[in-house]
A protein has these predicted regions:
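N-terminal intrinsically disordered/low-complexity leader segments
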Residues: 1-9
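Residues in soluble alpha-helical coiled-coils and helical-bundle/repeat scaffolds
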Residues: 5, 51-55, 81, 99-103, ...
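Helix-turn-helix
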Residues: 13, 17, 21-55, 59
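Solvent-exposed, amphipathic alpha-helical segments
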Residues: 13, 17-24, 71-74, 110, ...
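Hydrophobic alpha-helical connector segments
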Residues: 59, 73-105, 156-159, 181
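Short, basic, alpha-helical segments at the C-terminal edge of helix-turn-helix-like DNA-binding modules
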Residues: 62-69
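Amphipathic alpha-helical packing segments from all-alpha helical-bundle domains
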Residues: 103-112, 119-147, 157
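Hydrophobic/aromatic-rich alpha-helical bundle segments in the mid-to-C-terminal region
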Residues: 125-129, 145-191
Length: 193
């Protein structure tokens, strides 16, 4: 009797192997053979799931979009604004979550490398722009629910810039972590000065 293979699970295993490869060397230097080896399969077997590296990268960008959207929504759904003394405290708590991933949350940390690829590959670039559009829309909805509709697209986009910058700095180990519990408060200090 033939073994039944969960194709989606295999694809996810390959995407996670791709992510591990990217932690070892730049995305443009990672080959399908590297990924297959990391996934514990042959190169021809990997090609049953992804026809080429671009298809794999596009799937990774899609995975990233879905992951970020889902986790952002979950954070806001499980953290009531009423539990915090102010909007500033609430948004600082969210940014602390962004800066300090909870243990066991396997974030797609190679996302920042795909942002660069998007500049050189139109299809990947389009997918990344769609990722940001969806993510911004989700953020706008979350912010509107907190601020009773007084917040719009611009504030959501500002949060996207802040979140993306935090991810990029974390990926490179550039943050000290000393301000992770008051990121927005420190930005507010600039506006008040």
């Amino acid at each position: 009797m033939p073994i039944i293979v969960d194709k989606e699970k295999m694809r996810m295993d390959i995407l996670l192997a791709f992510q591990r490869c990217i932690e070892k060397k730049p995305i443009d230097k990672v080959t399908l053979r590297d990924i297959a080896g990391e996934a514990g399969m042959s190169h021809p077997k990997l090609l049953n799931y992804f026809e080429n590296k671009d298809a794999l990268v596009l799937s990774y960008v899609k995975y990233t979009r879905e992951f970020m959207t889902k986790h952002c929504m979950e954070w806001f759904e499980t953290h009531s604004r009423k539990e915090y003394e102010s909007n500033l405290a609430y948004m600082n708590a969210f940014m602390k979550y962004v800066a300090d991933a909870p243990e066991g949350e396997l974030r797609p940390n190679a996302t920042t490398q795909t942002y660069i690829l998007g500049h050189y590959n139109d299809e990947i670039g389009k997918m990344i722009r769609e990722e940001f559009k969806e993510w911004r829309s989700v953020m706008e909805g979350c912010l509107r629910s907190i601020y009773d509709g007084d917040i719009g697209r611009e504030e959501a986009e500002a949060m996207m810039i802040l979140i993306s910058g935090t991810f990029i700095c974390n990926y490179n180990g550039a943050l000290t972590g000393e301000i992770n519990d008051n990121i927005i408060g420190n930005i507010a200090n600039l506006a008040e000065s």
